[in-house]
A protein has these predicted regions:
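Solvent-exposed interaction patches of small proteins and small membrane subunits
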Residues: 1-109
Length: 109
């Protein structure tokens, strides 16, 4: 197993963890519960960092995968920094990463 496959397995693991954390909960729950919201943020950060470590070769080979999904959601209005509100973080944690990455990443490994 190569380095990218290990990274992708970790991303899949983090997405599964997010799925468990957000299951049957809405944005309001996380807005009112800082420790649970921090769990989502932690996993989203780990996924973003892991996505950035995947080699360009793999990213080019699997160009159907949006490797920048987190960066795209986190860009501020000036497109120079990163910020996420509760809604963006919840959306990433509860559905976007599962819908946009999970199956495609499973095809890679």
């Amino acid at each position: 197993m190569n380095k990218d496959e290990l990274i992708i397995k970790n991303i899949i693991k983090y997405i599964n963890e997010l799925d468990l954390i957000t299951k049957d909960k809405d944005k309001t729950f996380f807005f009112d519960n800082t420790s649970e919201f921090n769990k989502i943020i932690n996993r989203v950060i780990k996924i973003g960092e892991s996505l950035s470590k995947v080699s360009d070769e793999t990213k080019n080979k699997y160009s159907n995968i949006n490797w920048n999904i987190i960066k795209e959601k986190a860009l501020d209005e000036e497109k120079v920094g990163y910020e996420m509100n509760v809604k963006d973080t919840y959306d990433l944690g509860s559905k976007l990463l599962k819908e946009e990455l999970y199956e495609k990443l499973n095809e890679v490994i």
